[in-house]
């Protein structure tokens, strides 16, 4: 029995040695190969300028990071059918052939980060990687995401695209990533979020878009993100954000909107209302404009603080100037002119909304309908209410022709002719101007001053006549 057990032990040792030899024997010279806990070929920071030849076909993990590799040729790892983890980060990769990862059907993690010279990736590069769940493409100098780049990556859960030079998010780029939970897009140059940018991301939990140049978010951009819990939009160029875009985010818990040039006028009211109902954790939303609200948190403002832009509750018509306005360049929605049937929705600052608070303003002579008896209207009835009451006579003194009620004379009080050098002195002209000026007097005051002025000038006129007839003494 002892002799049999001794023979079995030697056989087991021989088998283990053979397994170790099969892994270690073909190991490239600059690498270390081992099989516990997984069969691994490790060649980090060895100054390699190319993918080494002779990598064991049984390798499950290959570490080639921190070298000087600039090119990954097609079929570089085709023999490694069991490969699950491949690290190529921190090299000087400038080109990856489209079929570089062909045959790696079991690959789960691929790290290509910190290759600033890469700049672009062939759309077919990741085809066939059906089990890939983590993909690092951060700090690769990427300028665009080619169409179909992530096609077929149904198992992908983590996608790192931060700190690149991406300027746009093409439609349906992530459409096949139904299991993606983490998407990192911060530190790019993205200027807008279109409607279909995140279409298909039904499982997304975390979306990081901070430190970009986002100035506009489409109202339906987040439509498929019902499971999103974290949204970072800080340090962008957002001056407005449609509340409609946030409405689908029913699971949202963490929202960061700070460090944006928010414009806190009436266009911010929908966002303000949404923030009042939000029960998760959110950053401050400091206003940049108007100046009177600069630095104040939008969430802590009152509804009547958000003034300065005509907003209709019914249909509204955009103001079009024929060129891009400063507001459009900032990503602001255009102010709206109220529909003719809904002018009551234009509010004056400091006045509550009510059915009787109708749009009021200056009515030039001839524009009012005949017989308009709506009561006195003043210059401060304009939508902005910023002009002093003494700036012009009250509009009750301005009547369009033909609008006087029956029984009133249609001709106004007779006015004195203008000053003339032939029949008036300078003092006479000054007296005439004083009697007819005032800026804030009504018609009755002007007409009452004329007879008194005529009486005061009568002796002077008589003296002039006598001087003309009799001559100087």
From Swiss-Prot:
The lineage of its organism: Eukaryota, Metazoa, Chordata, Craniata, Vertebrata. The gene is RTN4R. Residues 346-447 are annotated as: Disordered. Residues 448-473 form a propeptide. One of its GO terms (biological process) is negative regulation of axon regeneration. This is Reticulon-4 receptor. Residues 1-26 form the signal peptide. Belongs to the Nogo receptor family. A lipid is attached at residue 447 (GPI-anchor amidated serine).
């Amino acid at each position: 029995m002892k002799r049999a057990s001794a023979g079995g032990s030697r056989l087991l040792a021989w088998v283990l040695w053979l397994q170790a030899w099969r892994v270690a024997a073909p190991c490239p010279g600059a690498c270390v190969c081992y099989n516990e806990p997984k069969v691994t070929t490790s060649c980090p920071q060895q100054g390699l300028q190319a993918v080494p030849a002779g990598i064991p076909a049984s390798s499950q993990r290959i570490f080639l990071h921190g070298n000087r590799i600039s090119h990954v040729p097609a079929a570089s790892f085709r023999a490694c059918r069991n490969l699950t983890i491949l690290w190529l980060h921190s090299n000087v990769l400038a080109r990856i052939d489209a079929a570089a990862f062909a045959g790696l059907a079991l690959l789960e993690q691929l790290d290509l980060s910190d290759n600033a010279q890469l700049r672009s990736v062939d759309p077919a590069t990741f085809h066939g990687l059906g089990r890939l769940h983590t993909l690092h493409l951060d700090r690769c100098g990427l300028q665009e995401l080619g169409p179909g780049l992530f096609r077929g990556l149904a198992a992908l859960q983590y996608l790192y695209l931060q700190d690149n030079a991406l300027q746009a998010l093409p439609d349906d780029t992530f459409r096949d990533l139904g299991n993606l939970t983490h998407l990192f897009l911060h530190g790019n140059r993205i200027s807008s979020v279109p409607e279909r940018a995140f279409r298909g991301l039904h499982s997304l939990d975390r979306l990081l878009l901070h430190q970009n140049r986002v100035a506009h978010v489409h109202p339906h951009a987040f439509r498929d993100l019902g499971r999103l819990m974290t949204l970072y939009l800080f340090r962008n160029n957002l001056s407005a954000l449609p509340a409609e875009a946030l409405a689908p985010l029913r699971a949202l818990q963490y929202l960061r909107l700070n460090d944006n040039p928010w414009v806190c006028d009436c266009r911010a009211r929908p966002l303000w209302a949404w923030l009042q109902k939000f029960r998760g954790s959110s950053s401050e939303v400091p206003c940049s404009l108007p100046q009177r609200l600069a630095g104040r948190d939008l969430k802590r403002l009152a509804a009547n603080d958000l003034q300065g832009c005509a907003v209709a509750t019914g249909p509204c018509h955009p103001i079009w100037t024929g060129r891009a306005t400063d507001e459009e360049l900032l990503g602001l929605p255009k102010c709206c002119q109220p529909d003719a049937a809904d002018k009551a929705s234009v509010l004056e600052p400091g006045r509550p909304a009510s059915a009787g608070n109708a749009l009021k303003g200056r009515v030039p002579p001839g524009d009012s309908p005949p017989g308009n008896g709506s009561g006195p209207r003043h210059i401060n009835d304009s939508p902005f209410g910023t002009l002093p009451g003494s700036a012009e006579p009250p509009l009750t003194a301005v009547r369009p022709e033909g609008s006087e009620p029956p029984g009133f004379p249609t001709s106004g009080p007779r006015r004195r002719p203008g000053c003339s050098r032939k029949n008036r002195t300078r003092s006479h002209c000054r007296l005439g101007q004083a009697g007819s000026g005032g800026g804030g007097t009504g018609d009755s005051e002007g007409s009452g001053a004329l007879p008194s002025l005529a009486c005061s000038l009568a002796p002077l006129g008589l003296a002039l006549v006598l001087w003309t007839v009799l001559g100087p003494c």
